[in-house]
Amino acid sequence: MPRFEAQKSSMVPYHIRQYQDSDHKRVVDVFTTGAEEYIPSTFRHVLRLPRTFLLLLGVPLALVLVSGSWILAVICIFFLLLLLRLLARQPWKEYVAKCLQTYMVDITKSYLNVHGACFWVAESGGQVVGIVAAQPVKDPPLGRKQLQLFRLSVSSQHRGQGIAKALTRTVLQFARDQSYSDVVLETSTLQQGAMTLYLGMGFKKTGQYFKSMFWRLVDICFIQLNYSFPSA
């Protein structure tokens, strides 16, 4: 199995290599933790929405006017905040559960045994600290051969060391070697760090959309990005 050249940051060395079955537990941990980190930021984003402010102000105020009880209003605010927290949590939990029940069940089968696909890990100190995957786009635009980047995640203790950029470069090099014309991916307006990384590496924004009514209600859209190779 090929290994890629070791990379060094100013703090600790790491190297990028293809996934092995023995990595599975740690890969799942990195993926799950990375995805669920967006639950608090989604909740904070929801709290900043004007419609949320109106909800948290209007409903308790209506209760005070009807019942005359400020205690009831405070209890109402508490339960509204709890409900909003659960709503912010649900889509990320569903996303993780869906991935763990499909592509992530057997990573070798889903990626390494698929022509034109791959899954890599970043390893530091004998431990997997970052992951990224890529699969061919099933129905690319006419005349294009596209690879989609998925699952990019780096453990919180190893961020700021260039690992995410190195993993992305690994995907780009793989795509170039496999004669793909483009690398495409999706991220969200909530993931500003990822957006900054991709745009800084030459990806271009090609579109945006809301994945579901929930994302529309909370005003979080998904951004489509494309990296086209000059020779394509």
Swiss-Prot record:
Lumenal side: 84-232
GO terms for biological process, alphabetical: acetyl-CoA metabolic process; amyloid-beta metabolic process; negative regulation of apoptotic process; peptidyl-lysine N6-acetylation; positive regulation of gene expression; regulation of macroautophagy; regulation of reticulophagy
Disruption phenotype: Nat8b-deficient mice born with Mendelian ratio and do not exhibit any apparent physical abnormalities. However Nat8b-deficient mice display activated reticulophagy and macroautophagy. Disruption of Nat8b ameliorates the proteotoxicity phenotype of a mouse model of Alzheimer's disease.
All ranges on the Cytoplasmic side of the membrane: 1-62
Tissue: Expressed in brain (at protein level).
GO cellular component, one term: endoplasmic reticulum membrane
Keywords: Acetylation, Acyltransferase, Endoplasmic reticulum, Membrane, Signal-anchor, Transferase, Transmembrane, Transmembrane helix
Transmembrane segments: 63-83
Membrane topology annotation: Single-pass type II membrane protein
Catalyzed reactions: L-lysyl-[protein] + acetyl-CoA = N(6)-acetyl-L-lysyl-[protein] + CoA + H(+)
Top-level enzyme category: transferase
N-acetyltransferase domain mapped to chain residues: 79-224
GO terms of molecular function: protein-lysine-acetyltransferase activity
Modified residues (N6-acetyllysine): K109
Subcellular localization(s) per the UniProt record: Endoplasmic reticulum-Golgi intermediate compartment membrane; Endoplasmic reticulum membrane
EC number annotated for this UniProt entry: 2.3.1.-
Posttranslational mods: Acetylation on Lys-109 modulates enzymatic activity.
InterPro entries on file: Acyl_CoA_acyltransferase, GNAT_dom, NAT_camello-type
Span of the signal peptide: none
UniProt cross-references to PANTHER family, sorted A to Z: GNAT FAMILY N-ACETYLTRANSFERASE, N-ACETYLTRANSFERASE 8B-RELATED
Family: Belongs to the NAT8 family.
Cited function: Endoplasmic reticulum (ER)-membrane-bound lysine N-acetyltransferase catalyzing the N6-acetylation of lysine residues in the lumen of the ER in various proteins, including PROM1 and BACE1, using acetyl-CoA as acetyl donor. Thereby, may regulate apoptosis through the acetylation and the regulation of the expression of PROM1. Acetylates and stabilizes BACE1 immature protein, leading to increased steady-state levels in neurons. By acting on BACE1 expression, may regulate amyloid beta-peptide formation. N(6)-lysine acetylation in ER maintains protein homeostasis and regulates reticulophagy.
Name under which the protein is recorded: N-acetyltransferase 8B
The encoding gene: Nat8b-ps
